[in-house]
């Protein structure tokens, strides 16, 4: 994404070390030259006395003299300027030994930080003995649990019990795992069935792993009219880098956990749609491309202390995963046979696909080879695309991102009439559907415009004929953007004002990263009236979307309302609303509405900075505030 190499991609580590060695060599050479000059008795040049000119018509010693002006700079001033320049630029100086030592120390520390980021987790925190469990897809009557256990604690007995406000129910046996081996990296999915809808359960394993989950509501029940879930993409442990943090800590997951805790249990998401780049095999350094190397990366992420927090671990939220390029290689478009895809697919299948939702009703492919998924939860159905496994090279007339089987399955899903009460169709893509990003566009749907148009045509038809709303969710970009795609049949009667901002059409919300970097370079802009820009939020190292659906009334008519809330670094900064009538009517769907926007509020941004500083600095911040108040008093 963005470029040929991801930041901080694998070219950067050797460049940093090479630059340090060159820098230290130049320091050594400069010091050696200075010593040689000192040994040869070389003295620094001194300033000459000012020359005197005789005045016009002068005749002797007593004649008037004029002195040419000269500027004298003391050696102390020269040293001070040189020291400042050395500290500012990092260049060595012969005029100030302390400044040179300081700048050398800073450069060595920065290089050591780079080595620490690359190697500390690899060397000091081995992951082969990771024992871990998490919740996968949960339906109204079943749940999937992922478990990894390499420590010979077999067999593993699985039990579960109902939890309510009156106490825990009687433990029920769900089965036993008798063997785990290296063929699956000591992992296995566990299926629990026969559950009650809309119920909280605790699962327990005999290897001391446990967790909780909530089953989905029964279709057609009052609870099935509501839904809340979250969506994001892209995580890299301990990046942006913090030297005193655990090398596997995922700062964005910590922010997500604390944000959800503040929202309360009533606003708990039913699941997380994580849209790719769960690992970065080539960031900051690709150690290899074997199955072992890819498995190592998954284990490092799951070894993070960010998963092990109380009272409610993020591992208790059902994480549903799709594949993107950094689980394979940057901007991957070489199919599912070319190396390193087979090695990359191994841990993805074991760690994620094994507990993902079921495959579509008609996948048009062999079930064991299908890595796209579909499910229904309450008022919404979902289709999770695989945009990497089947894609061809972009920018050709017949370029395909999905492959023929997945494309056919998706078209059938879009035009399939949903059961009563299901008013939303969500389609997830690991890369943006819009072509408004102007860097790396061929890696997005902008490189597959013919296939994109075929899908948009089907979506417009579904909204016109089926009375459902189609929403696109995507990731990959370390930025947020909301875009809409107006139906050309309806747009022909639109006013020029409708070709910007909120309005009608298929809507896409692209959010990321959950825990990565962002760039100060602006790369998203509207260029035509096909992709209408609604909102662009590039800043923030942690972004996720919270999507909520509930019934509402508009002008006396009962509707299903979806709110998309964007959270940046733990704070809600933007909210957008879409509605669809509960009673099917053959008419255009209402336009989207902006509910909240404080992204460009400098007062709000400054308030957020001060609150963050106050929280992090504690006593130091209070001292700063006190000193500031005293300075104001003195100024008065």
Where are these regions (language model features)?
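Metal-dependent phosphoester/phosphodiester hydrolase catalytic core
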Residues: 1-636
